[in-house]
């Protein structure tokens, strides 16, 4: 992606943030040879992320599996903020021919609307409809769940057995190889800055 194209998508990111409103987070990722990074983010109060936050594991796997060669975009999948807040996510693949050069993500925070509906249901005393609403609202593409992480360290916590994260735990060579292979399969090394952090965690030198 050249600088001119990059600047156009940065402007588009903030434009969509203004047009769609505060319940929509817009995130523009640039994909380079050095990895992916956030170039612009609008309404980031929804996830709490910043320009320094990494690409998500979900998006990294899409890159690693070259999903962008099969589809131009993905719509209406689950995205998780923190431990319990569910929002709706959609991803548009920015391609120069068949080469992925960027990703534009739109995350819709429906929590206010959902809370309002649940309160209305509660006022009407309609049994457990609030729980039913929570269960069916993400029925489409239910198998796809994205976690919006603030740092590469957060991604390691999601991806690696928690017992290995103990600083006193001594990883064997086999365990290090297995962890590195798992992170590769998830596309973690597509994230800019991931290699030195993973190398430090595994206590190995950078390749």
Where on the chain are the PLM-derived regions?
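Phosphate-/nucleic-acid-contacting segments
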Residues: 172-207
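Short, glycine/acidic-rich beta->alpha junctions
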Residues: 8, 86, 190
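Juxtadomain coupling helices with adjacent low-complexity linkers
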Residues: 2-10, 15-19, 102, 108-169, ...
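Sensory/regulatory domains in signal-transduction proteins
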Residues: 62-123
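Conserved mixed alpha/beta catalytic, RNA-binding, or beta-rich assembly cores of soluble enzyme
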Residues: 90-93, 124, 157, 173-181, ...
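Structured interaction and signal-relay segments at domain junctions
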Residues: 17-82
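Short secondary-structure junctions and interdomain/linker hinges
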Residues: 19, 23, 27, 163-167, ...
């Amino acid at each position: 992606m050249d600088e001119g194209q990059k600047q156009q998508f940065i402007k588009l990111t903030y434009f969509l943030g203004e047009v769609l409103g505060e319940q929509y987070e817009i995130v523009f990722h640039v994909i380079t040879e050095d990895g992916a990074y956030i170039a612009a983010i609008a309404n980031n109060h929804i996830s709490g992320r910043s320009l320094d936050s990494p690409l998500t594991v979900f998006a990294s796997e899409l890159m690693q599996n070259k999903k962008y060669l099969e589809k131009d975009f993905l719509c209406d999948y689950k995205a998780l903020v923190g431990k319990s807040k569910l929002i709706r996510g959609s991803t548009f693949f920015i391609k120069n021919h068949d080469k992925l050069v960027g990703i534009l993500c739109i995350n819709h925070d429906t929590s206010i609307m959902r809370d309002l509906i649940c309160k209305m249901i509660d006022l009407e005393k309609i049994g457990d409809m609030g729980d039913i609403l929570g269960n069916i609202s993400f029925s489409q593409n239910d198998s796809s769940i994205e976690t919006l992480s603030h740092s590469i360290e957060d991604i390691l916590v999601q991806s690696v057995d928690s017992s290995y994260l103990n600083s006193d735990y001594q990883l064997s060579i086999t365990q290090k190889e297995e962890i590195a292979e798992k992170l590769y399969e998830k596309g973690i090394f597509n994230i800019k800055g991931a290699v030195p952090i993973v190398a430090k965690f595994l206590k190995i030198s950078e390749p």
